[in-house]
């Protein structure tokens, strides 16, 4: 590997705009590096939705399966539907699909005001808590063995 002396490089460009091109470029560079150093696996989206007769989403779960893992990104239930086990059914459907795809584990993170008890009640185990996030809250990280 050729080392570059960074002392002769010009100033860093610092942004606060979240430019999609900048994010894409760094993501692609990191992905290229990662693929050279780990086994190949494919990220496959998974979505489970409850919609009304017009197609309006009332509840849903989105995520991806990646190798051995179901990674849950978002789970939302309309307030008028909460308390009817719809979240449980969405989660169970996503986990069943992940098992069909060969996943052994699930991962999710949630804020303290969202659903920590929900995930614990479904067999998820807390593995990490990010304190004072973003200022006074907590962000909880959970995993679960699917098999």
Residue spans for each PLM region:
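Conserved N-terminal entry element of GNAT/NAT acetyltransferase domains
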Residues: 1-18
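Conserved active-site tyrosine of GNAT-family acetyltransferases
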Residues: 26, 119-120, 124
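A conserved beta-strand-loop-helix scaffold within acyl/acetyltransferase catalytic domains
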Residues: 41, 52-53, 61-75
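Short hydrophobic/aromatic beta-strand element in the GNAT-like acyltransferase core
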Residues: 45-49, 60, 74, 139-141
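A conserved beta-turn-beta hairpin within the catalytic core of GNAT-like acetyltransferases
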Residues: 65-73, 82, 134-139
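Conserved acetyl-CoA-binding loop-helix of GNAT-fold acetyltransferases
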Residues: 83-96, 121
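Conserved GNAT acetyl-CoA-binding A-motif
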Residues: 98-111
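Conserved catalytic-core motifs of GNAT/GCN5-like acyltransferases
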Residues: 107-109, 125-142
């Amino acid at each position: 590997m050729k080392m570059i002396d960074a002392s002769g490089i010009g100033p860093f460009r610092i942004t606060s705009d979240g430019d999609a091109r900048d994010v894409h470029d760094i993501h692609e560079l990191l992905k290229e590096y990662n693929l050279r150093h780990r086994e190949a696996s494919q990220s496959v989206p998974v979505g489970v939705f409850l919609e009304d007769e017009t197609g309006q989403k009332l509840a849903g779960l989105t995520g991806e399966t990646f190798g051995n893992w179901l990674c849950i990104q978002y789970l939302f239930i309309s307030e008028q539907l909460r308390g009817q086990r719809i979240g449980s059914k969405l989660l169970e459907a996503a986990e069943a699909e992940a098992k069909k795809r060969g996943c052994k584990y699930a991962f999710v993170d949630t804020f303290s005001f969202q659903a920590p008890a929900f995930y614990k009640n479904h067999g998820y185990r807390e593995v990490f808590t990010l304190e004072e996030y973003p200022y006074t809250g907590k962000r909880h990280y959970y995993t679960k063995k699917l098999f």
